[in-house]
UniProtKB/Swiss-Prot annotation:
Taxonomic superkingdom: Archaea
The organism's taxonomic lineage, starting at the top: Archaea, Methanobacteriati, Methanobacteriota, Thermococci, Thermococcales
Keywords: Cytoplasm, Protein biosynthesis
Gene3D superfamilies reported in the protein's UniProt record: 3.30.1330.30, eRF1 domain 1, eRF1 domain 2
Oligomer and partners: Heterodimer of two subunits, one of which binds GTP.
Cysteine pairings via disulfide bonds: none
A molecular function GO annotation: translation release factor activity, codon specific
Name of the protein: Peptide chain release factor subunit 1
Amino acid sequence: MSHKSAEMYELKKKVEELKSYRGRATELVSLYIPAGYDINKVMQQLREEYGTAQNIKSKSTRKNVLGALERAMQHLKLYRKTPENGLALFVGNVSEQEGVSDIKLWAIVPPEPLKVRLYRCDQTFVTEPLEEMLRVKDAYGLITVEKNEATIGLLRGKRIEVIDDLTSNVPGKTRAGGQSARRYERIREQETHEFMKRIAEHAAKAFLPLLEKGELKGIIIGGPGPTKEEFVDGDYLHHELRKKVIGVVDISYHGEYGLRELVEKASDILSEHEAVKERKLIQDFFRHLVKDTGLITYGEREVRKALELGAVDTLLISEGYDKVRVKAKCNACGWEELKTMSEQEFHVYKKKLTHCPKCGSQNISFEKWDVAEELIKLAEESGAEVEIISLDTEEGQQFYKAFGGLGAFLRYKIQ
C-alpha cells in the first residue's frame, strides 16, 4: 500500500471522529487553508473573528468560541508557511458535561491539495471538503447481457454497485415451421434489437457523466452466450463508450452475482484494481493458514509482537477495526493499567474505574489512542507494507469476522 493510501485511511478515521461531535451551541470552529495561501492573512482573519466573538451574548458560548480561536491562533504560530497540501484545523469544546470546557484541536494536512478556503463556527465541524477527498473517483463500468435480461453496474474502489436491472419481452424460440417461423423469428430479432438499444441507453445514462469527469477507466461486458458479442459488435453503445470497452468475458450468472463473477473472470484485465488485489491478498492469507506455514499471524497481541520484532512483511487492517488502546494511571501512587478495548467499552471502563485499586485515590487520569494508527506507525518504522482491507468484498468480510480484522504476513517464522 502506498504512503498516500495509509494517509487516506487515517484521514477517514479522523473524519469519522470529527463527525461524531456536536456542540451545545455554534462553538465548533472549522478552518480550511488552501495550498499556497498566505498563513498570515489567516491569522489576521482569526484576530478579527476573535474581536467579533467577544460580543456573543451567551457567556458559556462566548468562552468556548474565544477559547477555540485562541487555540487555533496558537497552533498556527507553529507554521512559517502553509503546508504543501494546505491545512485543515478543527477546534472546539467537545465536553459532554454542561458547564465543563474541554477544548480540543485537530490539525490535518490532507493527502491531496486543498482547494477551498473556509472559516465556520457551527454546532458541527465542516468535513465535506475532506470527505470529497475520500470519495473513490476511478470507476469501471460493468454490463452483463443475455437475450432477456441485463444488469448494469459499477466497480468503484472495492465496491460493486448495481445501477440497473433490465428485462426484455424477447420471446423464446418456436417450433413452428414455414412462414409462421420466419415471421416469429423477425419479431424475435426486432425485440432483441430494441432490448439492446435500451441497454445501451441505460449504459449511456450511467457511464457518460463519469466519462465527462474523467472517472470512467473502462467498461467490461459479460454474458453466458453470443448475445454479449452481438451487443458489442452491433452499433448500440454510444461511440465514446465503445472506445472504453476493455474486455468481453464469458460468465454464467446474471444480476448482482453476475457482476461479481464478471469482476472475478476479468481479474487479468483488472489485475491492478483494488478489489482484485484485495481478493488475492486475503486468499493468500487463508492459504498460509490452512497449510500452517507459520508465515502469518493474527490478533492484536501477536501482530504487535511481530511488528516490534521487525518480522512483519505486510500488515493487514480491516476498515472495520475500531479498537483503542487505553492507559489508566493513578496520579497519587503511580499505579498503571494498559488495555485494548472498543470506544464503547472505554466509556464503561472510565465510569467504573473511579478509585485506584492500589491506594484508593480518586485522582485517576486516562490516555487513549487508536490501535490501528499505532500499528501503522510501527509498520512504517520497520519498513513493512500496510494493506487496508475493505468490508465491501466477501473476503474482506470473512477476514473481519474470523480474525477480528487484524493480521500480518511475516518475513520469517517467529516463536
